[in-house]
């Protein structure tokens, strides 16, 4: 193989690697965007839960207890 063919082969291999890396990066970017949406949703749910706890007993000196949530039949 002469030098020109060797360079063409190396350039072709680099182009293939670059295309594969672009696909991987696009996939990772989509995954990061999906995880960001999930995190935003979880943060909103946590804020809502915290607000409900505060609204339920805003002047409480004691921390919130799950025992307060026991149904009356227990």
UniProtKB/Swiss-Prot annotation:
The record's listing under InterPro entries reads: SlyX
Q: Which family does the similarity line name?
A: Belongs to the SlyX family.
PANTHER family, per database record: PROTEIN SLYX
Q: What is this protein called?
A: Protein SlyX homolog
Q: Which organism is it from?
A: Neisseria meningitidis serogroup A / serotype 4A (strain DSM 15465 / Z2491)
What gene is behind this protein?
slyX
């Amino acid at each position: 193989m002469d030098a020109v063919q060797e360079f063409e082969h190396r350039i072709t291999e680099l182009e293939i690697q670059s295309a594969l890396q672009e696909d991987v990066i696009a996939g990772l970017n989509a995954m990061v965007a999906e995880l960001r949406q999930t995190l935003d949703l979880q943060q909103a749910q946590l804020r809502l839960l915290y607000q409900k706890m505060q609204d339920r007993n805003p002047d409480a000196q004691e921390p919130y207890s799950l025992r307060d949530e026991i149904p009356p039949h227990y």
